[in-house]
Amino acid sequence: MHRDAWLPRPAFSLTGLSLFFSLVPPGRSMEVTVPATLNVLNGSDARLPCTFNSCYTVNHKQFSLNWTYQECNNCSEEMFLQFRMKIINLKLERFQDRVEFSGNPSKYDVSVMLRNVQPEDEGIYNCYIMNPPDRHRGHGKIHLQVLXEEPPERDSTVAVIVGASVGGFLAVVILVLMVVKCVRRKKEQKLSTDDLKTEEEGKTDGEGNPDDGAK
């Protein structure tokens, strides 16, 4: 029999929720840190990390924790582990003895370990935390994906070759442009020099030779 999660149904929209938390004074709300997606190899052990920041130290008499599982976003939640003065493993038939608590609430760590992950374990794992007198409940959501085999390693050789080729091509283009620019500049300077010489020679011919004029 599935156990319902400790999760009161929200009575307001996501927009209202965002507005509500935006009005909470900085440092007064609980922050929960989890990976959005966790890829795990079939048959391996997976640590579902969940840590939190609170304004208050953890009092085990007041602190409470719930871990739940969902097959999909719209599916009902099944609670499989909780903390009430101590860790209580509910040992769902789905997980049996494969779930272990691996965190330490006093260190703001409430992570769990899932042994021998199976394809049926794929889904959403929710971490709910209450740490009175903090009035705000923390919530983290992890999407667990089970892989049938290890993903192939990315070969960076092709990327390096392409990058080097592009870089070399650009270097050659820049070099050619610089050479062309230098050649043009030299030609312009030579033309200016030739024009100046021609102008000076023209002036000399126009003035003539003073001795010839006397004769």
From Swiss-Prot:
* Residues that bear Phosphoserine: S192
Outline the extent of the Ig-like C2-type domain: 32-154
Which InterPro entries does UniProt cross-reference here? Ig-like_dom, Ig-like_dom_sf, Ig-like_fold, Ig_sub, Ig_V-set, Myelin_P0-rel
| Superkingdom as given in the UniProt entry | Eukaryota
Q: What are the site positions for Binds SCN2A?
A: Y56, R135
Q: Which residues are glycosylated?
A: N42, N66, N74
A cellular-component GO term for this protein: voltage-gated sodium channel complex
Has keyword Phosphoprotein?
A: yes
Please state the protein's primary subcellular location: membrane
One function term, GO molecular function aspect? sodium channel regulator activity
Transmembrane residues, as ranges? 158-179
Positions where Phosphothreonine occurs in the chain: T204
Assembly and oligomerization: A voltage-gated sodium (Nav) channel consists of an ion-conducting pore-forming alpha subunit functional on its own that is regulated by one or more beta subunits. The beta subunit SCN2B is disulfide-linked to the pore-forming alpha subunit. Interacts with SCN1A; regulatory subunit of SCN1A/Nav1.1. Interacts with SCN2A; regulatory subunit of SCN2A/Nav1.2. Interacts with SCN3A; regulatory subunit of SCN3A/Nav1.3. Interacts with SCN5A; regulatory subunit of SCN5A/Nav1.5. Interacts with SCN8A; regulatory subunit of SCN8A/Nav1.6. Interacts with SCN9A; regulatory subunit of SCN9A/Nav1.7.
Q: What name appears for this protein in its UniProt entry?
A: Sodium channel regulatory subunit beta-2
From which lineage does this chain's organism come? Eukaryota, Metazoa, Chordata, Craniata, Vertebrata
